[in-house]
Amino acid sequence: MHQRRMESRFLCAELARVSWMVGPDRHQTEEAILEDICATGGCVQLEEPIPVGSVIMVTFRGQRFDGRVRYCVSGEFGYFIGVKFAADTPWSRDLAVPDHMINLDTVTM
């Protein structure tokens, strides 16, 4: 069954920094590629997995978006990490616009 999203999702190609906790007192920060984004979440590609449910911070263009990992799927060049943004840090075009952004609602096949 296909899910219908309530908001537009945008494909993009943007370098981002991703931070998450890897223990009770240590966090890890890695470079990532922001693959897609919408008001409530996005997908980043990393070289290593992040456990589902982990608190995560995605930063690009000087803006930070907090959230939780919803999925982590192995791909050919790393892992695709789905992030649901926290209600107090939603994304909008007014905050940060990724490079090469394509609105999937306007793509026809």
Model-inferred region functions:
Residues 1-109:
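Structured alpha-helical
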